[in-house]
Amino acid sequence: MANSFPLRVLPTIDPSAGHTFITPSKRIHESEDVSEFLISKAYVDIMTFLLQLNRAMIPVKLADGTVQSWPINTDAVEFSAPVRQLQQLLTKLEELLAEAPPDTGPRRFGNISFRRWYELVESRASELLGECLPSELLQAKSSDPNSVTAEAELKAYFLGSWGSPQRLDYGTGHELSFLAFLAGIWKLNGFPKTTPGVEERAIVLGVIQPYLELVRTIIKRYTLEPAGSHGVWGLDDHSFIPYILGSAQLAPAISETDPTPEEGSLPGAPSPNGVTKAHIVERERLTNMYFSAIGFIYDVKKGPFWEHSPMLYDISGIQAGWGKINKGMIKMYNAEVLSKFPVVQHFPFGSLFSWDRDPNAVPPPTSAHMSTTQSQSRGPAVPSAGQTPPSGTRAPWATATQAAPPAGAGTAAPWAAKRDGCTPGKPPTSLPDTSRLPPGPMAPTRAPWAASSTGQAPGGDPTHVPTKAPWAK
């Protein structure tokens, strides 16, 4: 066994070496630009930071043979001064909600009072950041005396983290912006250097989880629409990161020399199919980020879980454990968030997240993930050798072990397995053998809707074909 696992860590900027800050600007103007993004330094830095946080949330084997896990509100994670300052920032943003009460008039989409709240945040952004972040970090000077300070870059990602005041929506692109805001602070040496995993866990539990909770409050208060969503065919209307970090919390424990687990679960962890049971969700949402996100779905959606969240329902049938779910979620984030034009088109690029090509990057294959829809001139993506194309809206790496809902109980998910011994659609036999570490772009998973066949609802009328998404082939 190797002495240590080769863990990539997001590099920090050496202030003495000179650095020129740049006001972030839009570089992704059309779907073809996504291919350039996937070989950029910005992409590598984002994935490096996310994987760094992900590994930190996996339970740890201690020297005495016990296991330390990292639930929400654990006493085992201490918050550094920068983390507490960021918590103060989130508190101030929450307090601003009182100054923008929801409009009581008729509306079709979103509450226009969200624009008022966002205007308050935008007008006070420099003041808020100045109160909650060190001045030496914000006012870090460029080597070019005519250039901007670090604040200009951080503020762009900070303001991009709360939704769109024009469209009255919030989605994974805004969540990505907050991840970049934190990664930018990391690159500027804004977090203390500690034992690997220590500060990362504080960032996740002390900042990211409170951020997600604040965002959920904002979404409910102003009835924000999903941004860049695939609707019922997507994973979640608004978020993705809690499913990555929450599945990591439930993965099997590792030592510092172990690779990131790709299957198995922490002993005593709830079964993945617990997401379909409201009482389990209510219990687990208090300690786990995955179930916390599921709990929000229960808060805002009605009806059978398999009907309004078919992909999460599909994933709940995986029997290989939370380690496999975690691996799949990372691959899916790459494919469904970072490789999707509608999601990343608004992400701005400066010096902290550079549009320059990473020298070690390998150009990604052309993929339907990089555009809003699949090209009309070509069929679905061809699966890897040895794999059977997934059917319907299945997560590409899920297995057909989840029981189907009762026949006749509303519109069935087209990919759900039939009961009474009927053979479900054959799932993919294996996951592509891809590294979980950058620098090259991760091999994107197939779009879940890319299968050419249309499934029939279990127990339904064979002449009835489920309604397809408008962008499905």
Swiss-Prot record:
EC supergroup of this enzyme: isomerase
CC terms in the record's Gene Ontology section: cytoplasm; nucleus; protein phosphatase type 2A complex
GO MF term set: peptidyl-prolyl cis-trans isomerase activity; protein tyrosine phosphatase activator activity
Known EC number: 5.2.1.8
Region ranges (Disordered): 360-473
InterPro entries: Phstyr_phstse_ac, PTPA_C_lid, PTPA_sf
Alphabetical keyword list: Cytoplasm, Isomerase, Nucleus, Rotamase
Subcellular location: Cytoplasm; Nucleus
Function: PPIases accelerate the folding of proteins. It catalyzes the cis-trans isomerization of proline imidic peptide bonds in oligopeptides. Acts as a regulatory subunit for PP2A-like phosphatases modulating their activity or substrate specificity, probably by inducing a conformational change in the catalytic subunit, a direct target of the PPIase. Can reactivate inactive phosphatase PP2A-phosphatase methylesterase complexes (PP2Ai) in presence of ATP and Mg(2+) by dissociating the inactive form from the complex.
Name assigned to this protein: Serine/threonine-protein phosphatase 2A activator 1
Origin species: Aspergillus fumigatus (strain ATCC MYA-4609 / CBS 101355 / FGSC A1100 / Af293)
Lineage of producing organism: Eukaryota, Fungi, Dikarya, Ascomycota, Pezizomycotina
